[in-house]
Amino acid sequence: MSDPRYPIGKFSYTGPLTAEQKQQYLTDIEQTPSRLRAAVRGLSDQQLNTPYRDGGWTPRQVAHHVADSHMNSYIRFKLALTEDEPTIKPYMENLWAELPEAKHAPIEVSLALLDSLHQRWMLMLREFTGAEWKRAFRHPDLGPMSLEKTLALYSWHGRHHVAHVTSLREKMGW
């Protein structure tokens, strides 16, 4: 049986990306809000509060996490575009997911945020001509991260978390 933590597999980057790969990853990022919205559509509060696996997050926590994570990524892109390889501050995503608002807030709050955030993010990304993809930030644990690699990562990240919700729905017959 495959690992339920990674329903689409672990992230892998073999860069540099082809033009076709970049286009696909841009499309993935652009569609993350609508894909997540479709994945959670019609779920009851009880279903939204059901972990996708033992010890895993609930669809509610997943929705709030994707908003938290993608806000951080958007800011990291801006930092990398305006500073020379800035060192970013990581955040404790598992602890953020345990905060009361991540466990109880209506998911529409984060879905609406993602809609607006991704519109802004795509306006930025669609303007990239070439050199911007090579710009980077430094992650204290992972080292330098080019914006090209980060594009691939967040394409995967959105699909990964949507798959958490859709695999739960499939498993539970929802």
Describe the function of each predicted region:
Residues 17-27, 83, 104-105, 112, ...:
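Solvent-exposed interaction patches of small proteins and small membrane subunits
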Residues 1-8, 12-14, 49-94, 119-123, ...:
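Short, contiguous alpha-helical
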Residues 25, 51, 99, 110, ...:
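Generic anion/oxyanion-binding catalytic loop in active/binding sites
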Residues 20-53:
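Short, contiguous, helix-prone interaction/anchoring segments in small proteins
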Residues 28-39, 96-134:
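Acidic/histidine-rich alpha-helical segments that form the ligand environment
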